[in-house]
């Protein structure tokens, strides 16, 4: 009889709301750690939903909307067969981000001399903070930036490879042929952006700027 009672006690403990919440929290930590690999090497997940809102199965399938952020206060869908629960979760993520190392004036270029990688809580940074230093290659500041300030994508733009009024080469490629002609750029554009060109004939064409400043058109 004592053995039976102990069995019931163990079962009650295993399936208690607290134990289930801890297990779901551990699964969520693993799930977010996998998705944040390459950005964060230290992830702390806190389940905020009450125990009565947890999924009933032991290993639910987690998902989020494609545009959802991966840290801070987020909502996660937990599915068990036909059951679907929405869980409120707080995710703390620590990793590297790009910060200003020396003052940068508006219009100034971002270089290894004036930016650096810093380590900190990604979930506490401003929106669209740059995490990959390669994203600022050939970038120009849109405002004055102070040392220590996280670099956000809204603060920078790519340097113009082509400027309005500049003479450019237009290269039209088709199946088995390539045609070159000269024209005048009608707008500023960075590499991989679209530029409109007025040809000597007066015709206006549009193409993609390459790294050499040529305008490429695929026919």
Curated annotation (Swiss-Prot):
Q: Quick one: where is this thing mainly located?
A: periplasm
Tagged with keyword DNA-binding: no
What's any GO biological process attached to this entry? bacterial-type flagellum-dependent cell motility
Q: Does the keyword Mitochondrion apply?
A: no
Where do the TM regions start and end?
none
Instruction: Enumerate the InterPro entries for this protein.
Output: Flag_basal_body_FlgA_C, Flagellar_FlgA, SAF
Please provide the record's keywords in A-Z order.
Bacterial flagellum biogenesis, Periplasm, Signal
Per UniProt, subcellular location reads as:
Periplasm
**Which superkingdom does the taxonomy of this entry point to?**
Bacteria
GO CC annotation = periplasmic space
Question: Which Pfam families did the record assign?
Answer: ChapFlgA (PF13144)
The residues the entry assigns to the signal sequence are 1-21
Instruction: Briefly state the protein's biological role.
Output: Involved in the assembly process of the P-ring formation. It may associate with FlgF on the rod constituting a structure essential for the P-ring assembly or may act as a modulator protein for the P-ring assembly.
What family does the Swiss-Prot or TrEMBL record give for this protein? Belongs to the FlgA family.
Q: What is this protein called?
A: Flagella basal body P-ring formation protein FlgA
Q: Where does this protein come from, organism-wise?
A: Salmonella typhimurium (strain LT2 / SGSC1412 / ATCC 700720)
Protein's gene: flgA
């Amino acid at each position: 009889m004592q053995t039976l009672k102990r069995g019931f006690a163990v079962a009650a403990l295993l399936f208690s709301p607290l134990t289930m919440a801890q297990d779901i929290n551990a699964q969520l930590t693993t799930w977010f750690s996998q998705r944040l690999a390459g950005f964060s090497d230290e992830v702390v997940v806190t389940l905020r939903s009450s125990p009565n809102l947890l999924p009933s199965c032991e290993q639910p399938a987690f998902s989020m909307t494609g545009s959802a952020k991966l840290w801070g206060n987020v909502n996660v869908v937990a599915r068990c067969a036909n059951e679907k629960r929405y869980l409120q979760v707080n995710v703390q993520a620590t990793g590297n981000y790009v910060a200003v190392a020396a003052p940068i004036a508006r219009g100034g270029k971002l270089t290894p001399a004036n930016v650096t990688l810093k380590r900190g809580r990604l979930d506490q940074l401003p929106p669209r903070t740059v995490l990959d230093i390669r994203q600022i290659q050939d970038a120009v500041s849109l405002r004055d930036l102070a040392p220590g300030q996280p670099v956000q994508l809204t603060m920078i733009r790519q340097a113009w490879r082509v400027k309005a009024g500049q003479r450019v080469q237009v290269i039209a490629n088709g199946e088995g042929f390539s045609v070159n002609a000269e024209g005048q750029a009608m707008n500023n554009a960075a590499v991989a952006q679209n530029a409109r060109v007025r040809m000597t004939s007066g015709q206006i064409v549009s193409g993609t700027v390459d790294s050499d400043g040529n305008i490429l058109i695929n026919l």
